[in-house]
Amino acid sequence: MEEVAPEQVQEVQGNTEAHIDSTTASTAPTEALPSDKQSRKANEIDSMADGAPAEKKQKTDQRQIIREPKLDDNGNPIPREPRLPKRKVAVMIGYCGTGYHGMQYNPPNPTIEAALFKAFVDAGAISKANSNDLKKNNFMRAARTDKGVHAGGNLISLKMIIEDPEIMDKINANLPEGIRIWDIERVNKAFDCRKMCSSRWYEYLLPTYSLIGPKPGTILNNDIESSKTELPGVLDEDLESKEFWENFEAAAKKEFTPEEIAAIKDYSPPPREEFDDQEELYQKVKQWKLLENTHRRQYRISEMKLNKFRAAMNQYLGAHNFHNFTLGKEFKDPSAIRFMKEIKVSDPFVIGDAKAEWVSIKIHGQSFMLHQIRKMISMATLIARCGTPVERISQAFGPQKINIPKAPALGLLLEAPVFESYNKRLEKFGYKPIDFSKYQEKVDAFKMKHIYDKIYAEEVSDNVFNAFFSYIDSFNKVTGAQTEESAESNKPATKSIFEFLSAHGIPGIDYGKNEKEDSNKESSNDQVNKESAPATSKPAEAVEQTEKN
């Protein structure tokens, strides 16, 4: 503001007062101004003397705030850095989620975003002045992943300093090997990666021995077998699983005496304070489990069972009410409706030193709810291993509430977010489209080294999938999980909480006639309709595409 000399102020004030006096003298007498008007007039006069309106002067005074310097961890002032321009960018990333409490920033827990943000600051992509607040940098993620979940491709958007042509290499140098930056692309200021993401691809890796039927003597196995007697013809006869367990029993008889086998089956762990890992019987139990795990990893899935699993997964295609596949959603909640665009189940492949067989399931959907994919995988796997009609999945989209357990997080990874519709707008404004396929070779190598190998190794060491399905098989809705022997002894008073997998079906649904006969009739009618449909029929093309996937 231009300074005014004291004599100039006096001159202005004098002229103003003279002007007011002359104006008052030349007019007829009037009522005195109210006090608030007088004070406002006086303020205007003062402001004229200062050379600025009163309101502007007040705002100017308010802006004169003394800012305290930012301090480092030791309490020393952080020197100001030169201000460099920040640009709105999309950062393509991949990471192994092992050891992290999910993607989202959540101090003091280690998260992917915390590691990324630190690397951005250390590399100079974010100034130290803005290093304590993600919001200052307009930080946003395309997809949030939970604890332990991996991503071959994910995307974050934020404002960054990208003048340095080597900024991406510098960021990667400050990141652990399990987190990588694939690329940094300029985007327009309005870009919001979460809202602009049109769909997402997820992958789930599943060992095929997860599809072996429940172990004989468990609660779930007993429920399934008894329901077959009560309602014959509803469930498939799983001769493949029956043969597997018979072969294991034969192998066990070669390694253990009848007395040892009986003692092992009767074994229940003592209280923690009395536990002795050197006890002879406990060592025998460990040998039994080792033999069972070795036998399980030698399992190779049949084409019939794999096709059953594929048919179960295809039940999810299209728009459905997934209220049973998440937490805290009611049937009438419109947000429970989700659309699955494409599902692929790979051919089996053998990998790792253990030579176990796996399949890859890829799911392309517009959006997903909490635990939805893990519950989808779990339901389809339970359907295939129990011989249950695949139509139970479509029935689970109805209003009846059922308990679907969530499969282990170990096999889940985010393949990539998709920005199909927004890419057209980006190109229109002169920006490059967001396309993860450009980095596919690097992403695949990273996934094999830092994600797939860790999944395989963790399953071999911890038997995550076997532990999960063993827990499901022996779960009792009255007393919780129990051993096969205690389940057998309490058989009349126990029933699996997963009764919907048995021939009885989902409670509350009137199946009328034999469910399998009805589904066979529907399949026959569908086949007739397909054969009679014109060659250009779109539904027929859609079915063909689904079968290929």
Curated annotation (Swiss-Prot):
| One cellular component (GO) term of this entry | nucleus
Where this protein primarily resides, as one coarse class?
nucleus
Which Gene3D superfamilies does the UniProt record give?
Pseudouridine synthase I, catalytic domain, C-terminal subdomain, Pseudouridine synthase I, catalytic domain, N-terminal subdomain
Q: What subcellular locations does the record give? A: Nucleus
Quote the InterPro entries the UniProt record gives: PsdUridine_synth_cat_dom_sf (IPR020103), PsdUridine_synth_TruA (IPR001406), PsdUridine_synth_TruA_a/b_dom (IPR020097), PsdUridine_synth_TruA_C (IPR020095), PUS1/PUS2-like (IPR041708), TruA/RsuA/RluB/E/F_N (IPR020094)
Tell me how the cofactor is bound.
Binds 1 zinc ion per subunit.
**EC number assigned by the record:** 5.4.99.-
Coiled coil start-end: none
The enzyme's first-digit EC class, named in words, is isomerase
Enumerate the catalysed reactions. Answer: a uridine in tRNA = a pseudouridine in tRNA; uridine in snRNA = pseudouridine in snRNA; a uridine in mRNA = a pseudouridine in mRNA
- Keywords carried by this UniProt record: Isomerase, Metal-binding, mRNA processing, Nucleus, tRNA processing, Zinc
Stretches with biased composition (Low complexity): 1-13
Please provide an example of a Pfam family that matches this protein in its UniProt record: PseudoU_synth_1
Q: Where is this region: Disordered?
A: 1-83, 507-549
The protein's required cofactor(s) are namely:
Zn(2+)
Highest taxon of the lineage: Eukaryota
Statement: the UniProt record of this protein carries the keyword Metal-binding: yes
Q: Where is the composition biased (Basic and acidic residues)?
A: 53-73, 512-524
Q: Which residues form the active site?
A: 146 (nucleophile)
> Molecular function (GO) terms listed?
metal ion binding; RNA binding; snRNA pseudouridine synthase activity; tRNA pseudouridine synthase activity
Q: Which protein family is it in?
A: Belongs to the tRNA pseudouridine synthase TruA family.
What does the protein in this record do? Formation of pseudouridine at positions 27 and 28 in the anticodon stem and loop of transfer RNAs; at positions 34 and 36 of intron-containing precursor tRNA(Ile) and at position 35 in the intron-containing tRNA(Tyr). Catalyzes pseudouridylation at position 44 in U2 snRNA. Also catalyzes pseudouridylation of mRNAs.
Give the protein name, as stated in the record: tRNA pseudouridine synthase 1
